UniProtKB/Swiss-Prot annotation:
One of its GO terms (molecular function) is structural constituent of ribosome. Gene3D superfamilies: 3.30.300.20, Ribosomal protein S3, C-terminal domain. This is Small ribosomal subunit protein uS3. HAMAP family: Ribosomal_uS3_A (MF_01309_A). InterPro entries: KH_dom, KH_dom-like_a/b, KH_dom_type_2, KH_sf_prok-type, Ribosomal_S3_C_sf, Ribosomal_uS3_arc, Ribosomal_uS3_C, Ribosomal_uS3_euk/arc. It comes from Methanocella arvoryzae (strain DSM 22066 / NBRC 105507 / MRE50). Keywords: Ribonucleoprotein, Ribosomal protein, RNA-binding, rRNA-binding.
Amino acid sequence: MAIEKKFVQEGFKKAMVDEYFLEKLERAGYGGMEINRTPMGTQITLKAEKPGMIIGKAGKSIRRYTKEMDMRFKMDNPQIDVQEVKKPELNAQMMATRLANALERGWYFRKAGQSTLQRIMDSGAMGCEVIIAGKLTGARKRREKFIAGYIKHCGKPVEELVDVGYARAKKKLGIIGVKVRIMPPEAVLPDQITIEAAQAAAPAPAEKKSPAAGAEPAKEAAAVPAPAESTAAEVEKIIAESEAAEAVTPEGAEGDEKAAAAKKQPKKKVVKTDGDSQS
């Protein structure tokens, strides 16, 4: 068998198993599956809103499904594990099934689509896309698309990050197809850049210096208290004294100068003659 044909058969078998569980476990809130091959056999992990309905009483239902995988799909030692979905609003298959049921109950397609989209975004999804196709209101088929947030449409991130779910709503006019694509909140895109805030550097510890020879006089000088500043009264007193010294008149200054000059001049001696004495 060619390798290409083997891959095609494996993909076809996986699609058939998924459709089988979707039909059998609709009431249990089926949310998809994963198939992994191990040395012990084939591990099948089912996601459901109500795991108890899949396991059944004393494990009766899950044993029946395991036997069906072995006989109908020829799987090697199948082992089924069931996981509970904590947030059904972030599971694309569950939301697609709920939307299809709402359309079958008579909800208007635009109201049902917007309501489903809002519930998914309120649960914290990064982005969501809801597509409803078929005979919605008239005789001709058409497609309505509802988009919110950010979602990838091509490339490898679509295969790894985007969750896709399909469902069908049976109405009188025909089948209406529903497709839901969800980008989970924890998805990390390859082109996403995160800038971290710079952390403040811790201050370096101060070095302990040995006391120098001239350090003690400096400490003593620093210990001497600085002279207190003059109070306002002392300042006013000094200003008044300086103004009084400047108020001396120039005449008084000249008299003082003449008195000082007279003291410096030598005194004249008067000699009396005989003529003066006789007269």
